[in-house]
Regions:
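Short amphipathic alpha-helices within nucleic acid-binding modules
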Residues: 92
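N-terminal pre-domain segments of enzymes
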Residues: 2-38
């Protein structure tokens, strides 16, 4: 690897733009006593050989505004990536060690998928929705350890992937873990599962043989 950090497997949602200024701000906010764990370790990671692949899509399922097209040949160097997403337990360890405060905690709210809210909680908690995608609901108090709002909990979900994590939060976690976030090309290369120009890692059909 040309980069000294390994890639961490974290799945932020509603990803904001990033800048070096954001990165420096995060670094400054973190405790000077933070400890770097697993630095250089590849435990729980898989190595991908890299090489050329066709990146992007021109399929109608893609979003042109996200720059997903045109399809172009891209090359990635060999790299490691976490075999599984970062769990609530792992993120909790990071927060305990550093005192890190996520962006949703500082904002005081986050988006919650409508399907995760029963009708009663939807009526009680939701302040607003996104105009074009109304299934994303603005919920006050939603954060990584209260993912569906103040009355929710991750106590029974410690080994499930952490949610309500922004790009900046993920960047901070990766730095603490002695790793880094994947580039867009690395992420797409890994997510394609070795298949070329297929919609999903298993092919182009969402539910082959009725299974997803």
């Amino acid at each position: 690897m040309s980069n000294p950090f390994n890639v961490v497997g974290i799945n932020p949602c509603c990803v904001p733009s990033k800048s070096r200024a954001d990165e420096l701000a995060i670094s400054q906010r973190m405790s000077v006593e933070r400890r770097i764990v697993r630095a250089g370790s590849v435990d729980g990671m898989v190595k991908l050989d890299g090489g050329p692949f066709l990146m992007g899509t021109e399929d109608r399922e893609g979003f042109p505004a996200d720059g997903e097209g045109p399809v172009r040949e891209t090359h990635v160097d060999p790299f490691y990536v976490d075999a599984t997403p970062v769990t609530n337990a792992q993120f909790a360890e990071f927060v305990k060690a550093t005192g890190f405060v996520t962006e949703s905690e500082r904002f005081g709210w986050s988006f919650v998928f409508q399907g995760h809210l029963d009708p009663e909680r939807y009526k009680k908690l939701v302040e607003d929705t996104v105009l074009i995608v109304p299934w994303w609901c603005k919920v006050p108090g939603a954060k990584w350890d209260r993912p569906e709002g103040p009355d929710s909990s991750i106590a029974s979900r410690m080994e499930m992937p952490v949610t309500q994590v922004s790009w900046n939060d993920a960047w901070a976690y990766a730095e603490w873990a002695g790793k880094r976030l994947p580039t867009e090309a690395e992420w797409e290369y890994a997510a394609r599962g070795g298949l070329e120009q297929q919609t999903y890692p298993w092919g182009s059909e969402l539910t082959p043989e009725g299974k997803h």
